UniProtKB/Swiss-Prot annotation:
Keyword Ligase included in the entry's annotation: no
Chemical reaction(s) catalysed: uridine(55) in tRNA = pseudouridine(55) in tRNA
Protein name: tRNA pseudouridine synthase B
Top-level taxon of the source organism: Bacteria
Family listed: Belongs to the pseudouridine synthase TruB family. Type 1 subfamily.
EC number: 5.4.99.25
Entry keywords, A to Z: Isomerase, tRNA processing
Lineage of source species: Bacteria, Pseudomonadati, Campylobacterota, Epsilonproteobacteria, Campylobacterales
GO molecular function: RNA binding; tRNA pseudouridine(55) synthase activity
């Protein structure tokens, strides 16, 4: 079974645990997901079964949009509503000040991922080390904030919708936002509502070619594609170097053109 869709991961489960439930549901062990969500977060997770599980690197998965609730005045080791160490009753902020900081935090932002994150350290998730009291050596990263807006502010809770690049951590954004206010803050909720063009729609199977980040190419002799025969650049409509997909009625293949040579990256993937 080839299938790709946007699933909705519930809060409290790791992405791997959630995938295991989907494997049982669809009775298919050959599956994968893209865009790990921390256990604390919920929302859109791209899931694929069968041959489609090999397509993640070709998908357009950015930008990503989240809804988040910032809890102002709270210090948490994990920057969420777990591991809370201190709660302060702070004065309510002028909405104009909050909007000003949000406007300042657009574009490229440097940050360090939170200790309680899904980042891997020598094969182990950082949050698994953090639970044991082991501090991971996480390298500084960059994220791009494309857009951010305030949805509501009911002190001490600030609800925002934020659109960011791949690899961004909203908890780190929350931490940086709080520093500019001169306070502590943590997330009380986080939901991913969109990943590229992927949105949750009851696990409806999608036409993967509409979500793939590749240009189409064309060949007159489609039998070559069906048989996995060697293809020469001269037989293709487009000759520029790069990755392309070529489709037949029932299948599609992904090829790479480099130094006047055509190489199959994936061949004869059945359409669903």
């Amino acid at each position: 079974m080839n299938k790709i869709f946007a699933a909705f991961k519930p809060r409290g489960l790791s992405s791997n645990s959630f995938l295991s439930t989907l494997k049982k549901k669809y009775k298919n062990k050959k599956a994968g997901y893209s865009g790990t969500l921390d256990p604390f977060a919920k929302g859109v997770l791209i899931v694929a079964f069968g041959q489609y599980a090999k397509l993640f690197r070709f998908l357009k998965k950015t930008p990503k949009t989240y809804k988040a609730t910032l809890w102002l005045g709270v210090y948490s080791l994990s920057l969420d509503d777990q591991n809370i160490k201190k709660i302060q009753n702070i004065k309510e902020f002028d909405l104009a000040i909050l909007k000003q900081i949000i406007d300042q935090m657009q574009g490229i932002i440097s940050y360090t991922p939170p200790q309680f994150s899904a980042k891997r350290i020598n094969g182990t998730r950082a949050y698994e080390l953090a639970k044991k009291g082991i501090e991971a050596n996480l390298k500084p990263c960059q994220m791009e904030v494309f857009d951010c807006k305030i949805l509501s502010y009911n002190h001490p809770f600030l609800n925002i919708e934020i659109t960011v690049s791949e690899g961004a951590y909203i908890r780190s954004y929350c931490e940086l936002f709080a520093r500019k206010l001169g306070i502590n803050a943590t997330l009380s909720s986080l939901e991913r509502i969109k990943e590229g063009k992927f949105v949750y729609n009851n696990e409806k199977s999608l036409n993967v070619l509409k979500y793939i980040n590749l240009k189409p190419n064309f060949i007159k002799d489609l039998n070559k594609l069906e048989n996995g025969a060697k293809i020469f650049v001269e037989e293709l409509e487009f000759h520029d170097e790069g990755d392309y997909y070529i489709e037949t009625e029932k299948y599609f293949s992904i090829i790479n053109i480099k130094e006047n040579t055509v190489k199959y990256l994936l061949n004869k993937v059945e359409k669903c």
